[in-house]
């Protein structure tokens, strides 16, 4: 019987070897991709539970299948915890991803072809904020706003003038590569001025918002979307919040039956665990440590004139660095750092001159190393290791030194092998 084959290692060695290799990679690499984090064993246990067997189209108390009384409890727990965590009146926890959450929000707020003002991808926005290769750019008429050419920060007066000119039905705030705090109150004032809805995609900063170390968009936005991983440290999935009952009904209809069929109740259970973890007072200390670590790491680059720190600093979990004075492009920097077991990604910088497949910059985030227990001292050490590798990118002996120093650091802060 299939139920006898419960051990992946014995039943499917080829797959197990790949999983084990990834476990080893995570243990012995320094993870600096800003959209990644390390979940607790409790989150993984919930996601690997028998809930994966259950179909539950619909919502708690109103399902299309029988036998849903247990998953109703699970989903209700997730909903109520999300509402409490973010101070929202309504929450939808069924969206499979942040992109699905954004798609549902658009469906709830606007019609195909409507004009939307969103952050340009090159300035730090996300694909779902209007990229022409994404469903958002294909379905709606997106106009991109950028950052100030001198400060590389959002210029709210300029965004207001742009909004007056294009008269959008919706304004999208939020980013995937913007290192500064966003003033959601100003964005709402801009939206009100032109009669537009305001949607905030807080996927990257959700954990910081939950902990109260970053301003919350919930009091200002008509709809807030998020992922549940990244700084929130939960499973990969989406979340939608609102304080408007009428919009909540539209959101629910947009998610199901508009975009999805059966929800992933095992993932929703893992979301519920993550929300409970984030409600613990210790999570605020964790979120503050992310900000402290990121600031400390960024400061090392700011003090080295061979690198340029975009916008001059960071207020959150992420920052961008122009590396073109020491290496040809961000892609080569990413590849080189992978070789010394430091994982990050190439990233376009504002007013980018290189191809998006090469880029002038790299993006660095500190959520994952903070989850391992690393602090300011380790963050500074990692910055120096990155600089050492990039500056000496043709020196095999020095690169091996960096690799060994990375191993010493990861051994000192084990992930799951404690």
Swiss-Prot record:
Its EC number is 2.1.2.1. Its cofactor is pyridoxal 5'-phosphate. It catalyses: (6R)-5,10-methylene-5,6,7,8-tetrahydrofolate + glycine + H2O = (6S)-5,6,7,8-tetrahydrofolate + L-serine. Pathway: One-carbon metabolism; tetrahydrofolate interconversion; Amino-acid biosynthesis; glycine biosynthesis; glycine from L-serine: step 1/1. Pfam families: SHMT. One of its GO terms (molecular function) is glycine hydroxymethyltransferase activity. It comes from the Bacteria. The keyword Calcium does not apply. InterPro entries: PyrdxlP-dep_Trfase, PyrdxlP-dep_Trfase_major, PyrdxlP-dep_Trfase_small, Ser_HO-MeTrfase, Ser_HO-MeTrfase-like, Ser_HO-MeTrfase_PLP_BS, SHMT-like_dom. Catalyzes the reversible interconversion of serine and glycine with tetrahydrofolate (THF) serving as the one-carbon carrier. This reaction serves as the major source of one-carbon groups required for the biosynthesis of purines, thymidylate, methionine, and other important biomolecules. Also exhibits THF-independent aldolase activity toward beta-hydroxyamino acids, producing glycine and aldehydes, via a retro-aldol mechanism. This is Serine hydroxymethyltransferase. It comes from Streptococcus pyogenes serotype M6 (strain ATCC BAA-946 / MGAS10394). The lineage of its organism: Bacteria, Bacillati, Bacillota, Bacilli, Lactobacillales.
């Amino acid at each position: 019987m299939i139920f006898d084959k419960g051990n992946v290692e014995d039943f499917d060695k080829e797959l197990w070897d790949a999983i084990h290799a990834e476990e080893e990679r995570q243990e012995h690499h320094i993870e600096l991709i800003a959209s990644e984090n390390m979940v607790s064993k409790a989150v993984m246990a919930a996601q690997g539970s028998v809930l994966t067997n259950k179909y539950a189209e619909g919502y708690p108390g109103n399902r299309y299948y029988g036998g849903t009384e247990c998953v109703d409890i699970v989903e209700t727990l997730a909903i109520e915890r999300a509402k409490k965590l973010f101070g929202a009146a309504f929450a939808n926890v069924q969206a499979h991803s942040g992109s699905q959450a954004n798609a549902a929000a658009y469906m709830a707020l606007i019609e195909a072809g409507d004009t939307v003002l969103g952050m340009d991808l090159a300035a730090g926005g996300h694909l779902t904020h209007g990229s022409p290769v994404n469903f958002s750019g294909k379905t709606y008429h997106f106009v991109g706003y950028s950052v100030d050419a001198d400060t590389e920060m959002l210029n709210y007066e300029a965004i207001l003038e742009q909004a007056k000119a294009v008269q959008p039905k919706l304004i999208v705030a939020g980013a995937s590569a913007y290192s500064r705090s966003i003033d959601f109150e100003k964005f709402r004032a801009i939206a009100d001025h032109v009669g537009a809805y305001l949607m905030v995609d807080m996927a990257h900063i959700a954990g910081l918002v939950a902990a109260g170390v970053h301003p919350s968009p919930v009091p200002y936005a008509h709809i807030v979307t998020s992922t549940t991983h990244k700084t929130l440290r939960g499973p990969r999935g989406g979340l939608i919040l609102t304080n408007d009952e009428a919009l909540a009904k539209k959101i629910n209809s947009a998610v199901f039956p508009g975009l999805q069929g059966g929800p992933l109740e095992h993932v929703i259970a893992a979301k519920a665990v993550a929300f409970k973890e984030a409600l613990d007072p210790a999570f605020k200390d964790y979120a503050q440590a992310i900000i402290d670590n990121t600031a400390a790491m960024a400061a090392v680059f700011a003090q080295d004139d061979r690198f340029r720190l975009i916008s001059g600093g960071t207020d959150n979990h992420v920052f961008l660095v122009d590396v073109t004075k020491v290496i040809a492009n961000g892609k080569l920097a990413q590849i080189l750092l992978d070789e010394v077991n430091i994982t990050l990604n190439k990233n376009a910088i504002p007013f980018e001159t290189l191809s998006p497949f090469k880029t002038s910059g790299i993006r660095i985030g500190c959520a994952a190393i903070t989850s391992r227990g690393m602090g300011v001292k380790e963050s500074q050490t990692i910055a120096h290791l990155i600089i050492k590798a990039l500056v000496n990118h043709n020196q095999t002996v020095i690169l091996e030194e960096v690799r060994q120093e990375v191993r010493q650091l990861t051994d000192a802060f084990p992930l799951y092998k404690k």
